[in-house]
Structure formats: C-alpha cells, structure tokens
Amino acid sequence: MAAWNYPILSLDDSRVGKAVIRNAPVSIKDLYNVCKAIRGMNVKEAQAFLQRVMEEKEALPYWRYDHGASHKSNISRKWKVKSGRYPKKAIKYVNKALENALANAQGKGLDEDKLKVVHIAAHKGIIIKRFMPRAFGRATKKYNRTSHIEVIVGEV
C-alpha cells in the first residue's frame, strides 16, 4: 500500500479533528459533489444539511458528473446550480467521517459550536475485480469501485 498523509495545512494539530474512511463502497462522482457542498460549512450546519438531503427535503446540487441529473425545485439559490440528486449512500459515509472527526476534535477539548469543515476530499480507492460466470463457459467482468474520504474540522 502506498504511503498516505493528510494534506499539509497551516493549522495547529491540537486545534483540529481528523478522520478518514478507506475503501468505502461509494461512487467517487457522488462523493465529489457531497464534499464540495459541505466544504467550509459549520459542522452542525453541515450535518443538518446532509440530514435534509437524506430526507429528500432539499436536493444536493451537482456541479460535476451531473449528466442526466434533472433540475430540482428544492435546491437553494445560493448554490447557483439547478440540477441535483439525493445521493444517500455517499451521504451516509460522509456523515460517518464527519462524526468521527467531530469526536476526535471533542477529545482534544475543542468547542463543538465553533468547529468548521476546513478540509474534505474524496479520492479513488482500490478496484475490486471479480468475474461473474455466464452461460456457455463465458465470464463477465464485474468491478467494484471504492473511494477514500478524508475530513478535517478546525476551530474558527
């Protein structure tokens, strides 16, 4: 496995909470849009937004990889995008990483209300290659793609 580190940010290590999830069985394309939406938000605000998207009360805007994503009437105008979706599986894993980073920050004694999503990113993970047997001795490739999620929350 290749060496991996968090990005070097100009933040004191005692003032941030970090979390990473490796090889999550989630689409990188969905994760990209989820990460872009909550980057820079307050942690409580981000969790509330993700909860509204899970309940389909508000659509998650799609800036990229939006081919076929229809326009949604419940997207806020602040996003300046019309197309969106409800990527529930991606939100589930991002929320888990966000909660882990929040718990790590609380363990360092940081104030929960002042925490902000300083860095969040999604990267391609490993590809699990499988073959599905078919009729007449043939086989079809089946690729399970995974993704990595990294979150850093810091006190503002």
Swiss-Prot record:
Protein name: Large ribosomal subunit protein uL22
Family statement drawn from the similarity comment of this UniProt entry: Belongs to the universal ribosomal protein uL22 family.
Keyword Ribosomal protein: yes
One annotated Gene Ontology cellular component of this protein: cytosolic large ribosomal subunit
GO molecular function, one term: rRNA binding
Disulfide-linked positions: none
InterPro entries: Ribosomal_uL22, Ribosomal_uL22_CS, Ribosomal_uL22_euk/arc, Ribosomal_uL22_sf
Organism encoding this protein: Metallosphaera sedula (strain ATCC 51363 / DSM 5348 / JCM 9185 / NBRC 15509 / TH2)
Self-association state and partner proteins as the record states: Part of the 50S ribosomal subunit.
Any Pfam family: Ribosomal_L22
Keywords (A to Z) from UniProt: Ribonucleoprotein, Ribosomal protein, RNA-binding, rRNA-binding
Function comment: This protein binds specifically to 23S rRNA. It makes multiple contacts with different domains of the 23S rRNA in the assembled 50S subunit and ribosome.
GO biological process, alphabetically ordered: cytoplasmic translation
Highest taxon in the source lineage: Archaea
Keyword Amino-acid biosynthesis: no
